[in-house]
Curated annotation (Swiss-Prot):
One of its GO terms (cellular component) is chloroplast. Substrate binds at residues 68, 118, 122, 240, 272, 324. It comes from Aegilops crassa (Persian goatgrass). The keyword Plastid applies. This is Ribulose bisphosphate carboxylase large chain.
């Protein structure tokens, strides 16, 4: 029934069935296995003919695969755990606007994770004060600052004013540090036309990157923005706001690894992926599974990490995972070890909550990162020696020492809801 409803079937036989080849177009369930430890749950493998899907359209793909079938009365629950995108279909998508290597070259930054900060409070600041916070963080040593997902164009801070003050912060901090800086200017809007207008203004300001909320904005809007960014040299940061409504429950909805694959096809250079160690949901092996699906060109099937199918992206550019949410300097060794160089480590309160101010908070993060990267390059074990590495760096960085003192007791020790077993 699931395969039929999402392909050629309906609730009764219809006379127009005779006008086409149902055998050619119908979906097929080709394997069923029980879920270990559950009496009434099964994993079903369903295959669909490629002719059912419009080329280059994530919107059409999801309308078929996760459409009406999820509302069937006959099903207590239904969850899409994974999907394999065959190369024949994935080649109809252009993928990320630029990809990891092109971003490295644009920023001229290599050999370490990138550092970011989400400006807080996320709502309520005036555009001028918002821009000031951006400048202080970038001047202190961060690579990026960021609009939060619900910063669009509200009465207290209209989008055009925010873009102007953030651009000023970028140029001023670049002149003082000699490094390329950026701010994720959120172009998400109520219409595609307005979204593109904001992206055009960002390009005219000469900033390197814009941002989109791809689930609330929609895949059609996201792919539209992706094409504009590719054509005009803008990097595209993606926020996954609303994902937990879809992916957090174990028995219904869709796993984030599916949303991650869809984003790679629709287009984005960064996407939030959880932290493993922070305040947001994310088991380590499962998170690393979909991080590999975002970054790597070829990923082998690995059920231990939740990867049900071997995925060949056929040289589609990779997406940089962004670790963000409840992280601070004590997490830096673990984040560096877990995510590696091709990642963005994004601290909001972990920068702006520094007792000495925003710039010292940024400096503390940069020193902690540089210390961890140096220790790793020297062959030290970050997982085992991480705290020792951070304490040693505190001796020559008073900003880091102050940050370590403030957050020494802050932990987020909750069991994840969505686990592999």
């Amino acid at each position: 029934a699931v395969a039929a409803e999402s392909s050629t079937g309906t609730w009764t036989t219809v006379w127009t069935d005779g006008l086409t080849s149902l055998d050619r177009y119908k979906g097929r369930c080709y394997h069923i296995e029980p879920v270990a430890g559950e009496d009434n749950q099964w994993i079903c493998y369903v295959a669909y003919p490629l002719d059912l899907f419009e080329e280059g359209s994530v919107t059409n793909m999801f309308t078929s695969i996760v459409g009406n079938v999820f509302g069937f009365k006959a099903l207590r629950a239904l969850r899409l755990e994974d999907l394999r995108i065959p190369p024949t279909y994935s080649k109809t998508f252009q993928g990320p606007p630029h990809g990891i290597q092109v971003e490295r070259d644009k920023l001229n930054k290599y050999g370490r994770p990138l550092l970011g900060c989400t400006i807080k409070p996320k709502l309520g600041l005036s555009a001028k004060n918002y821009g000031r916070a951006c400048y202080e963080c970038l001047r202190g040593g961060l690579d990026f600052t960021k609009d939060d997902e619900n910063v669009n164009s509200q009465p207290f801070m209209r989008w055009r004013d925010r873009f102007v003050f953030c651009a000023e912060a970028i140029y001023k901090s670049q002149a003082e540090t000699g490094e390329i800086k950026g701010h994720y200017l959120n172009a998400t809007a109520g219409t595609c036309e307005e979204m593109i207008k904001r992206a055009v203004f960002a390009r005219e300001l000469g900033v390197p990157i814009v941002m989109h909320d791809y689930l609330t904005g929609g895949f059609t809007a996201n792919t539209t923005l992706r094409h504009y960014c590719r054509d005009n040299g803008l990097l595209l940061h993606i926020h996954r706001a609303m994902h937990a409504v879809i992916d957090r429950q174990k028995n219904h909805g869709m796993h984030f690894r599916v949303l991650a694959k869809a984003l790679r096809m629709s287009g984005g250079d960064h996407i939030h992926s959880g932290t493993v160690v922070g305040k947001l949901e994310g088991e380590r092996e499962m998170t690393l599974g979909f991080v590999d699906l975002l970054r790597d060109d070829f990923i082998e099937k690995d059920r231990a990490r939740g990867i049900f199918f071997t995925q060949d992206w056929v040289s589609m550019p990779g997406v940089i995972p962004v670790a963000s949410g409840g992280i601070h300097v004590w997490h830096m060794p673990a984040l560096t070890e877990i995510f590696g160089d091709d990642s963005v480590l994004q601290f909001g309160g972990g920068t702006l909550g520094h007792p000495w101010g925003n710039a010292p908070g940024a400096a503390a993060n940069r020193v902690a990162l540089e210390a961890c990267v140096q220790a790793r390059n020297e062959g030290r074990d970050l997982a085992r020696e991480g705290n020792e590495i951070i304490r040693a760096a505190c001796k020559w960085s008073p900003e880091l020492a102050a940050a370590c003192e403030v957050w020494k007791a802050i932990k987020f020790e909750f069991e994840p809801v969505d686990t592999i077993d």
